Every structure is written in structure tokens, then in C-alpha cells.
């Protein structure tokens, strides 16, 4: 652990104004590793994501400076739409950063893309393998999870805390980090705190509860909106509990927060993938097709979640988005993804090696509902005169808080 006041820059060498021709500014993987993935066009080369600047990226038959972002967008990268490139290797590219607030007019580099001085090119795409036989598919998930857990257990993790809600995703992450304290956020009496208490007791883990108040919401709403550039209620309902957990862990001196992001998307955790042919929320009519639709939403979600966590002063660690688990998940047949009786079938089976049966089988509410954050933001909106009969009453309340925060900032 380190003093939260002494944290390194979140840019991770991600310059936005220059750098010498032989400099690289990457987060998530070494430059040589990313060059190899570029040369081979390998979308899953064995990382948990990467993004940044390469001075000499192997593009087609030559090398040139480039910005890159991995195939799932696990490391967000933003470019400035409003600044013309310059003339040196780095300056021939747009201004860029891993933090959108560094830029005047940020937009995300698409997941799997390479941006050179001449073009933005889709470089990597996710594999679309045929489903493996059930026994082989389950064995592949078991092996992948065993490798991820083993690597984490063998790594220095004194600076890591775990975001913990008592479900199978955070349970497996916590099991891979046996000495890390677990943090859960929510309003008094909420599902997530109750589930986390039960799971932590079953796993004999140190659980630290971040009890959210209305004052916390009034403070966090403009902070998260400013950090992410998003003011819609759904994004804030999801990001605020993460932000408040991360703040608490950072205040306790932790540098990294391990999260369960990606499990629902990869392994069939959403109700809409169970019977997609009759569910209007997806276009696909098969479980695998519906799962693929949810995987495609990950880059946009991670642009929100990763940025919100970093704004709280902590670096996210998402072991369930490891390439090994991604590759194994993509080969799962529908019956090991979701059925009317159970979702995330293969992941729960693999997790049984690491967590108690009750944790492996636990149902989990979406974070915005399990923490009561969505309910309580709605309550605050109505108390402040934004009634449900109004169009987008919660969105209007959020806008009012953001305007007040900006006025307060300008008066300082």
C-alpha cells in the first residue's frame, strides 16, 4: 500500500503533447508484446487489455507511430477531436490521454483499433469460434480460471482491495486474492450489503462496509459525471457505487481495486440472454448470439467504469477479463452460458473449486438496484421538485446538481 496522496499519474506515460520518436506510452502491456500482437493480428495475445502510443508500430509492410486499444477496450483511450496533429512522431497523431478530462473534446478510440497518421483502422476483432463440446468447453473454462487465480495468488498484492458484492464474480476474484480486504457499498438494508456479509462470513474474509448516504450521492453525482462525461441516470447509477468503493479503498491506502467486470457479458449473466427469441432487448435468437451482443457493449461500459475508478484515485484490476477466460468463454455452447434454471453455468461450475457452494450459486442484483443507488437518486430527485410526471425527472435533477457544482467551482 502507499499513501493515497503519493499516487502516480493516471496517464501512465500517456503524453498528450509530444515525446521523442523512440518513446512509447502504453498501459497494460510492454511495447514489444503489443508489437507482436499487431504483427500477428492476434486479438487475444495473453493480456488483460492495453492501450496507448507506440513509436514504431508494425503496420502492413512498415512501421509508423500509432495509438492502439485492445479488442475489448479494457483500457480506455481518448483522442481530442479539436486539435490538429503536429509533425513529430507523437505529434503526427491527435492529442490523446487515458483520462478524457485532459482533453478539450474527447472521443474514445474504438476497441480493437489502430490510429496512425493516415487513418483509423479496425485491426483486431474477437474470434467467432464454433461452440465446443460441453465437456471440452467446461474444461477450458476450468483451466483458464485456474491459470488466472494461480497467477494472482503468486503476484504481489499488498496494494489490492476487492470490490465485493457476495456474488460468484466478486467471490472468485476475492478467492484469488486471499489477503485482500473486501469492500461493499450500499444504502442501509440493501441486498448487496446483506449478500456480501453472508458471503464474507462463509469465506472468512475481512469485509469493510461503505454505507452510502444522500450526501454521498449529492457529492458523487457531479464528480462522476465530470470524470466520465456522462450524465444519464443509468450510467451514473452503475458508476457511483464503484466510485464510492474505490474512494474508500484509496483512502485506506490501496492502489488497486480488483473488480468482477466482464463476467456477466462473457458468461451469460444477463436475463435477456436466457430466451432471446422472445426477448425484445436483443436482436439475436440464440443464447450465444445474445451473449455476443452483450460482449459488444463492454468497451463502452469500461470507458465509464475504468475512468470512474481512476477518478476516485485507484487503478482497476479486472482478472475475469483476462484473455484466457475470454477465449474460453467464446467457445461455450449455449447450455453452458444460460438456461431458464441458471445463468453463468460454466463460470459457476469452475468457481466451485474456489468459493463455497452458496457463493458459487448466488444470484446477484444489478449494482444500481442491489445498492439502492437507483432508488435513492430517484427519491432525491422527487424531494427536490423533479416529479415522476416530468420527462426524465432524474436526468433533470442530475443536470441541476452538475450545474450547481460547476458554479461552485467557478466561484472558488
PLM features per residue range, with description:
Residues 18-20, 124-130, 279-285, 313-314, ...:
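Charged, low-complexity surface segments at secondary-structure and domain boundaries
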Residues 81, 100, 265, 364, ...:
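Short linear motifs in intrinsically disordered/low-complexity regions
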Residues 55, 105, 115, 349-350, ...:
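Polar low-complexity intrinsically disordered regions enriched in Ser/Thr and small residues
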Residues 134-354, 370-372, 376-382, 393-412:
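ATP-dependent adenylate-handling active sites, centered on carboxylate activation for C-N bond formation
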Residues 1-209, 214-215:
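Cysteine-centered catalytic environments shared across enzyme families
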Residues 355-367:
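Short, surface-exposed acidic
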